[in-house]
């Protein structure tokens, strides 16, 4: 059996392929020389790479290539664009444009629903709006979608980061909605809803891990050193963490409202019609799973926010303590300065170029020095004593609790007796049992007359 290709000619074919550039990216196929295909000279021809019969192959990119290069779009007042999936999970169209009013009329939507599916950069409150026996309008984070019983519309976005997440969602939807996944227990609309919720929870998890790593590292750094730059960074990151907490909290509330309403649960069945009396255990388990996961992110974010607030309070206490220490140091310096000023006041008087009758005294200099030092010491000691009483942080004046309680008991027994004695000497009237003086009618008339004269 002769070889199909002469190996000596392979290098020549490779050189020809390299030297002759191809103008168009066209697919090729191999043609066998078996069956007597010969050249006019009677020799067997070398298999060639010939063009396929169809010239349209490779002319347009596939839907998968478009999803890989999914890009944000420019908003339009007349059209909305979306990627469409059919009942088998296949991509029917990528970034297909629809007229807004025609789209609303076709899917029995109201003009107020246009804001939830419109391609815009405005973030609105997450919602899952159910149109009974018609469709499910979903708006959560970066996903705006419309789910029917045999079709899914995922609307495009203008945010580049959201466009990347939507590209991941497209592949998840395609694999989840495909009938090749095996026996499908869930309905079509529930599979689409679960794929969207999985993407939402994955986005929340990735965002929370980012916030936790950044804020946690800042908190660890602040435990070792209170830095102004770290505090500023913590303030900025705490704002972003608060926004994440609010987003996850709103998503949890949306899922909670769905679980609490049997009417909405019944309306989520589009393939089959169900009422409030039917069993929704499969759908409830689906929603409860992602509700629990979202609640976990809410609790963790709330705990991290509380840690940040506690750290801020501790930092404020430390800063207040440092500020008080600086003020105390300033007061001490002022007290020492005052003592030094008092000490130099008397020598200043003594050094005046005037007669003070002690210039010729042998004890004058020593007396002035001793008097100056003593006066400075007394003034400084008195000021430090006053400062100590001000800075003493106790609830009671006495630092000894037993002594304070004894003083309170003594005061409670001696106070009425002292009040009686004070009343005898002060009022010159016999006091009553409470220590108050007893006034007669004549005394009251004198006091009343005195008050009236004073008003005039």
From Swiss-Prot:
Topology of this chain in the membrane: Multi-pass membrane protein
Keywords per UniProt: Ion transport, Magnesium, Membrane, Mitochondrion, Mitochondrion inner membrane, Transit peptide, Transmembrane, Transmembrane helix, Transport
GO biological process, one term: mitochondrial magnesium ion transmembrane transport
InterPro entries according to UniProt: MRS2-like
Transit peptide: 1-38
Source superkingdom: Eukaryota
GO cellular component: mitochondrial inner membrane
Pfam family of the protein (one): MRS2-like
Main location: mitochondrion
The name this protein goes by in its record: Mitochondrial inner membrane magnesium transporter MRS2
Native species: Candida glabrata (strain ATCC 2001 / BCRC 20586 / JCM 3761 / NBRC 0622 / NRRL Y-65 / CBS 138)
Upper taxonomic lineage: Eukaryota, Fungi, Dikarya, Ascomycota, Saccharomycotina
